[in-house]
Amino acid sequence: MAKVQYFGTGRRKKSVARVILVPGDGKVTINKRDIEVYFGLETLRYIVNQPLVLTGTKDKFDVIVNVNGGGFTGQAGAIRHGITRALVKADETLKPELKKAGFLTRDPRMKERKKYGLKKARRAPQFSKR
């Protein structure tokens, strides 16, 4: 018998997360490591689990994630986006609830490019009057 799997791709800043939802007991694996090992901060684990807790599907699916690029916060946001998309594929009735919470929306904020003549994107070199 073929296993039922739901796929979702999430993005945030420079991070890309490929998420697979498999019916199970709520185990979250990120890059072949447990979520507690991968994300040390409680806030990042909270961000990842938000869509599952909101929809009440925390202990119905095992989450397998492959994520790369960006930093910890970007990766957590990308995983949340991917889980949300996979949940919508699994059950279309969850879409309005997830949309209202803002989890389906791709966060468009990216790092602003550095401009010439400046030290960073907006930081100007120190000004000296004399």
UniProtKB/Swiss-Prot annotation:
Similarity comment: Belongs to the universal ribosomal protein uS9 family.
N-terminal signal peptide: none
UniProt keywords, alphabetically: Ribonucleoprotein, Ribosomal protein
Annotated Basic residues bias: 111-130
GO CC terms: cytosolic small ribosomal subunit
Pfam family of the protein (one): Ribosomal_S9
Organism: Clostridium novyi (strain NT)
Gene3D superfamilies according to UniProt: 3.30.230.10
Ribosomal protein in keyword set: yes
Designated name of the protein: Small ribosomal subunit protein uS9
Keyword Ribosomal protein included in the entry's annotation: yes
